[in-house]
UniProtKB/Swiss-Prot annotation:
The keyword Chaperone does not apply. It comes from Chauna chavaria. Its main location: secreted. GO terms for molecular function: serine-type endopeptidase inhibitor activity. Keywords: Disulfide bond, Glycoprotein, Protease inhibitor, Repeat, Secreted, Serine protease inhibitor. Residues 4-54 form the Kazal-like domain. This is Ovomucoid. The record marks L16, E17 as: Reactive bond 3. Coiled coil: none annotated.
Length: 54
C-alpha cells in the first residue's frame, strides 16, 4: 500500500510542481501538498490510492 506522510500539513500555500497522486476519492492531486491538504480537510478519510494520475 502506498502511503504519504502528511504530518507536516496543512500548509497555507502549495508549490506548483507537478507530481500527481491519485486519492481514494478517485481525484488526481497535482502534488503531495495539495493531496495532504485535502487529507487534513477530510479528517483523515481520504487516503492515497496510488502515485500518478487516476
Amino acid at each position: 500500500v502506498a502511503t504519504v506522510d502528511c504530518s507536516d500539513y496543512p500548509k497555507p500555500a502549495c508549490t506548483l510542481e507537478y507530481m500527481p497522486l491519485c486519492g481514494s476519492d478517485n481525484q488526481t492531486y497535482s502534488n503531495k501538498c495539495s493531496f495532504c491538504n485535502a487529507v487534513v480537510d477530510s479528517n483523515g478519510t481520504l487516503t492515497l490510492s496510488h502515485f500518478g494520475k487516476c
